[in-house]
Amino acid sequence: MGDSYQVIVDRDASVDQSEHFGSIVLDWLIAERIVEPEASDCALGLGHRPGPGHLKATAEAPRWFMGQATNGMRIVTGRTVFNGWLDSELRCKQCGAVNSIDGLHDAGENWYEGGQGLLACSTCRFGEAITEWQILPPWGFGNLGFQFWNWPWLRDSFVEDISRLLGHRTVLVPGWI
């Protein structure tokens, strides 16, 4: 069956800022009782289990959710390509053409290694950093992510709250392993 995740990716935090902003959001999540303050092995690594206020983040709370061994929130810092779907669609913002994902992995790897990850549209030849392309389902390129393992779908208002708290653009990236 596998595990699913959703990552709220901060698109604007620098590597140097990621731990600071991660702490701000974690403190808020704990204060709102959305996650438990104690870290445990609940997120395929160290994370925070859902707290009694987790319904502020999700639209529902199925019975199975709280009983899962893997159901925590993990903070990921450092330059990361967050993706969960191999069958993605790349859409050019300039002309709207759907492009093959063939160049996506190379551009993502270039970005991960510190480059811009430039990618040119196969139709209009407009070149742009991979971070600015429209990718569906979304991918996230950033230095900070809040990864929620096996949580029911996160509320749009919750994602917006995180964006406001950070003062940055975010993208919600769904995936599974």
Language-model segments: residues:
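Short glycine-rich, basic-tinged beta-strand/loop micro-motifs
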Residues: G2-Y5, P137-P152
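Short secondary-structure junctions
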Residues: L26-S40, L104, L165-G175
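Cys/His-rich microdomains that often coordinate metals
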Residues: V98-I101, G127-I130
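Short linker/helix segments within small regulatory modules
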Residues: H105-A120, L136
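Residues immediately within or flanking Cys/His clusters that coordinate Zn2+
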Residues: D87-E89, L118-C121
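Long, contiguous alpha-helical scaffold regions
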Residues: Q147-I177
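Short cysteine-rich clusters marking metal-coordination/redox-active sites
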Residues: C92-C95, C121-C124
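N-terminal alpha-helical interaction blocks
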Residues: M1-L86
